[in-house]
Amino acid sequence: MDIAIQHPWFKRALGPFYPSRLFDQFFGEGLFEYDLLPFLSSTISPYYRQSLFRTVLDSGISEVRSDRDKFVIYLDVKHFSPEDLTVKVLEDFVEIHGKHNERQDDHGYISREFHRRYRLPSNVDQSALSCSLSADGMLTFSGPKVPSGMDAGHSERAIPVSREEKPSSAPSS
């Protein structure tokens, strides 16, 4: 099986229609020079085109789904263990915070931290919220919706993160 290996110089953004990785959720995976100067690098090789869809798919952006029966958030947190994650419900919001202290890896020392806040729909049953972390690092936060007119129960509380031994079945966009 042949695997194409691409030098980082060729993996740069080419202007306003090609998003930068600067604000993506690559928690500490490093930045290339084109992340800081995306327009400058496009003048070097004007005929090279980076795949827009590959950039979007690899960006690690969270996915929020809300249908008639349930509300679900998928978030890639592959660099964090359940002990590093805190999930809280504060009134109509869920706050997901991940932090691990400085530790050594192959390239030196690294520490990571992120904070995400999502608005919960008003009809989500907050007493039945759950959160799990799959073996491949996909955090799944979910809660059922109650029929309109019923009390969804809003309060402040922490949601424990359980670990699953199987990879995530989250749909890829």
Swiss-Prot record:
Residues that coordinate or bind Zn(2+) 1: H100, E102
Phosphoserine PTM sites in chain numbering: S45, S122
InterPro entries: A-crystallin/Hsp20_dom, Alpha-crystallin/HSP_16, Alpha-crystallin/sHSP_animal, Alpha-crystallin_N, HSP20-like_chaperone
Keyword Membrane: no
Keyword vocabulary terms for this entry: Acetylation, Chaperone, Cytoplasm, Eye lens protein, Glycoprotein, Metal-binding, Methylation, Nucleus, Phosphoprotein, Zinc
Subcellular localization: Cytoplasm; Nucleus
Residues carrying sugar: S162
Chain residue ranges for the region called Disordered: 144-173
Pfam families, A to Z: Crystallin (PF00525), HSP20 (PF00011)
One of the GO BP terms on file: negative regulation of apoptotic process
Residue ranges, compositional bias (Basic and acidic residues): 153-167
This protein's record includes keyword Membrane: no
Gene3D superfamilies: 2.60.40.790
Residue(s) carrying N6-acetyllysine: K70, K99
PTM notes: Acetylation at Lys-70 may increase chaperone activity. Undergoes age-dependent proteolytical cleavage at the C-terminus.
Domain sHSP: 52-162
Predominant subcellular localization, coarse grouping: cytoplasm
Segments for region (Required for complex formation with BFSP1 and BFSP2): 1-63
Positions bearing Deamidated glutamine: Q6, Q50
Cellular component GO terms, alphabetical: cytoplasm; nucleus
Task of the protein: Contributes to the transparency and refractive index of the lens. Acts as a chaperone, preventing aggregation of various proteins under a wide range of stress conditions. Required for the correct formation of lens intermediate filaments as part of a complex composed of BFSP1, BFSP2 and CRYAA.
Subunit architecture: Heteromer composed of three CRYAA and one CRYAB subunits. Inter-subunit bridging via zinc ions enhances stability, which is crucial as there is no protein turn over in the lens. Can also form homodimers and homotetramers (dimers of dimers) which serve as the building blocks of homooligomers. Within homooligomers, the zinc-binding motif is created from residues of 3 different molecules. His-100 and Glu-102 from one molecule are ligands of the zinc ion, and His-107 and His-154 residues from additional molecules complete the site with tetrahedral coordination geometry.
Protein name, UniProt field: Alpha-crystallin A chain
Organism: Melursus ursinus
Gene name linked to the record: CRYAA
